[in-house]
């Protein structure tokens, strides 16, 4: 993802492309986090930040997993196995991105589908691929949001929801080239949006909520200015009601990310992300950067906002 306001600040921090395996064999051993534990789930709407963190830990242990690599196949296996263990209906959507800077690349979107009597869909999304930088494990950028979405799936797949809910794990969000430029990005989310438009199901998607880089300590989530205002309002007002007003702030920031694939097709969408971190797209994006408390806060806002979203899209 790329922030128009922050891009110049971070371009110097971007790494350079490596082999398709992302030099997984040379990965630096991940460090354990030194943060206090996540709050008890009964204080965060049942969302367990410690469980979400364990998922991040497992994904980091795989090593680099850029699109098309052996590492990403192991990440896919892990995500699918976890979703099935929660009782979710899982759809694996294989596709090819034929025109990347490195040629044709096989990719896979993974979608957990939770049906209801109402056909309207609330779609949550996260990318799980890591940037093609040697030794880059993407603990925050790929890992944190995927961990949050897996824990959200555990809760949502076990209960009856008023609306149909899908949780999409996108491949190929990261650019293959060192810097972000269209069309070299968001391969997975663009593929899912296009396939839903082709099938006619896109009109059923009434809200799309993307999470990305939701692990740093002392996070600041700014209102993403491309996002749909009413959807951002629901998320941010929920955060304020829960006491997170100093984290979900009303300052704006423009971010290019997977949610644009749906916004461009007139689907209301919002992005929760803290890109203002010094380790973005560097090998310092390691496990010790991910705070279980931040995962719990993000998940708490997501799970508590579901009733308001269901009222809106009914």
What are these model-derived regions, one by one?
Residues 10-13:
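C-terminal motif of bacterial Sec signal peptides marking the signal peptidase cleavage site
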Residues 15-17:
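Bacterial signal peptide processing site
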Residues 28-74, 86, 129-130, 278-286:
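N-terminal capping segment at the start of a domain
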Residues 43, 207, 214-314:
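Active-site-adjacent substrate-binding region
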Residues 45-52, 65-76, 105, 121, ...:
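Solvent-exposed, acidic/flexible segments
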Residues 51-58, 74-85, 90, 144-151, ...:
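Extracytoplasmic/secreted proteins, especially bacterial periplasmic and envelope-associated proteins
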Residues 54-117:
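A non-catalytic alpha/beta surface segment that caps or lines the substrate-entry region
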Residues 132-238, 242, 251-254:
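Acidic/histidine-rich catalytic neighborhood of metal-dependent amide-processing enzymes
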């Amino acid at each position: 993802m790329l922030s128009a306001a922050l891009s110049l600040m971070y371009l110097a921090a971007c790494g350079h492309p490596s082999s398709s395996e992302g030099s997984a064999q040379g990965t630096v051993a991940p460090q354990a986090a030194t943060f206090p534990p996540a709050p008890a789930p009964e204080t965060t709407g049942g969302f367990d930040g410690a469980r979400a963190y364990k998922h991040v830990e497992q994904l980091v242990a795989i090593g680099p997993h850029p699109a098309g690599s052996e590492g990403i196949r192991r990440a896919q296996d892990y995500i699918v196995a976890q979703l099935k263990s929660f009782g979710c209906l899982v759809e694996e959507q294989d596709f090819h991105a034929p025109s990347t800077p490195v040629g044709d690349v096989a990719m896979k979107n993974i979608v957990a589908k939770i049906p209801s009597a109402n056909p309207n869909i609330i779609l949550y999304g996260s990318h799980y691929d890591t940037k093609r930088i040697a030794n880059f494990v993407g603990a925050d950028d790929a890992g944190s949001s995927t961990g949050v979405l897996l824990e959200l799936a555990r809760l949502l797949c076990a209960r009856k929801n008023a609306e149909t809910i899908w949780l999409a794990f996108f491949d190929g969000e990261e650019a293959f080239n060192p810097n972000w430029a269209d069309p070299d990005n968001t391969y997975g989310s663009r593929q899912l949006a296009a396939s839903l438009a082709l099938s006619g199901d896109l009109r059923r998607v009434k809200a799309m909520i993307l999470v990305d880089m939701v692990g740093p300590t002392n996070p600041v989530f700014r209102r993403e200015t491309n996002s749909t205002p009413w959807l951002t309002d629901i998320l941010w007002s929920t955060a304020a009601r829960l006491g997170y007003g100093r984290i979900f702030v009303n300052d704006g920031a423009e971010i290019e990310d997977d949610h644009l694939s749906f916004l461009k097709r007139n689907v209301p969408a919002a992005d929760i992300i803290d890109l203002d971190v010094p380790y973005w797209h560097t090998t310092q994006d390691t496990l010790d950067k991910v705070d279980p408390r931040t995962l719990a806060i993000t998940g708490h806002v997501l799970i508590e906002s579901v009733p308001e979203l269901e009222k809106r899209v009914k």
